[in-house]
């Protein structure tokens, strides 16, 4: 059984267990309430204690049943379609200055693309008519960053950036932001020395993302390193830290330059980066075992696959050869 199938089984198991626990609690609590109505416990003096206990059991059971249903459904539900128009500002307020920023932010897109998947019928109908349709709810409240704007925030979710850094990364200050960015960057540098096949379960990791639709044709895992996940997270945390006010614009520009130069030196093309990113992401996911792990994986694989292949993706018309040519064109000492 592949890792992907194991994750799906784990989610289904968790969902079923939660449903059963909830059902038992509802039956017991409901039974106590019915018995009270039938005066089976009329001799009990402090009936209010029984009422409270019964009500708590029923409420707890309903919550567990709902949670179990959500987990169960997430493992079986289909993935939404990417709305790439949400990654592009029609009129950038803070235009990017050079190819270093352009390509570093495109690397951030490997994560951002998983935040723009939607499956409501009205939006999908609009997307069919306009491949760059900007779904209104996402424009106002979505979490994704625009890739063609230095600041990136195009909606009303700016206030959530700090809470996102705090809840997911324990980043609450400039010092913590810089420490985390440095740690991720070190992870990417170390990952550059290790091939995908160096993972003890490399074949299982690769099989899982291929099962979910990633095309690894004509790519040699032995020649691709594992830096992808940390590399993408480096620029993601850096961009969020800048918007949160934890780092300065020049720091983000320096990080963008490093990320772009590293990518140009370590990956032949976008497909190799996507391959590295997904395999190293799954290695992390398997060890972290968060709730909804299988749903997270299938969404990430689909989003990255579409980001790499769709003609309306921000990646369309770009190449790492172009990025390497940019660095080669810089004056001696600047490249």
Language model features with spans:
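Membrane-interface catalytic loops of GT-C/OST-like multi-pass glycosylation enzymes that act
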Residues: 43
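Non-cytosolic membrane-interface motifs at loop->transmembrane helix junctions
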Residues: 46-47
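Alpha-helical transmembrane segments
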Residues: 21-29
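Polar/charged low-complexity regulatory segments
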Residues: 3-13, 17-21, 35-40, 50-236, ...
């Amino acid at each position: 059984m592949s890792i992907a199938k194991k994750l799906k089984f784990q989610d289904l198991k968790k969902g079923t267990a939660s449903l059963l626990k909830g059902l038992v609690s509802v039956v017991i609590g409901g039974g106590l309430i019915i018995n009270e109505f039938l005066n089976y416990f009329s001799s009990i003096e402090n009936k209010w204690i029984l009422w409270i206990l019964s009500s708590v059991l029923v409420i707890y059971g309903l919550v567990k049943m709902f949670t179990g249903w959500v987990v169960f459904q997430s493992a079986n539900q289909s993935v939404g379609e990417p709305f790439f128009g949400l990654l592009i500002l029609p009129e950038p307020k803070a235009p990017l200055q050079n190819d270093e920023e352009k390509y570093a932010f495109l690397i951030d897109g490997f994560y951002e693309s998983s935040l723009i998947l939607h499956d409501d019928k009205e939006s999908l109908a609009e997307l069919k008519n306009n491949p760059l349709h900007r779904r209104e709810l996402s424009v106002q409240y979505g979490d994704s960053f625009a890739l063609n704007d230095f600041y990136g925030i195009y909606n009303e979710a700016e206030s959530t950036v700090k809470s996102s850094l705090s809840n997911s990364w324990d980043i609450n200050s400039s010092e913590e932001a810089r420490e985390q960015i440095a740690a991720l960057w070190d992870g990417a540098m170390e990952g550059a020395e290790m091939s995908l096949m160096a993972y003890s379960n490399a074949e299982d990791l690769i099989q899982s993302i291929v099962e979910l639709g990633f095309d690894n044709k004509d790519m040699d895992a032995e020649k691709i390193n594992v830096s992808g996940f940390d590399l993408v997270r480096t620029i993601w945390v850096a961009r969020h830290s800048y918007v949160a006010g934890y780092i300065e614009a020049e720091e983000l520009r320096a990080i963008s330059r490093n990320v772009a130069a590293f990518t140009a030196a370590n990956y032949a093309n976008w497909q190799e980066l996507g391959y590295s990113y997904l395999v190293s992401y799954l290695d992390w996911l398997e060890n972290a075992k968060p709730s909804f792990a299988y749903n997270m994986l299938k969404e990430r694989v689909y989003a990255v696959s579409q980001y790499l292949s769709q003609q309306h993706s921000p990646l369309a018309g770009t190449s790492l050869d172009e990025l390497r040519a940019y660095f080669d064109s810089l004056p001696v000492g600047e490249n």
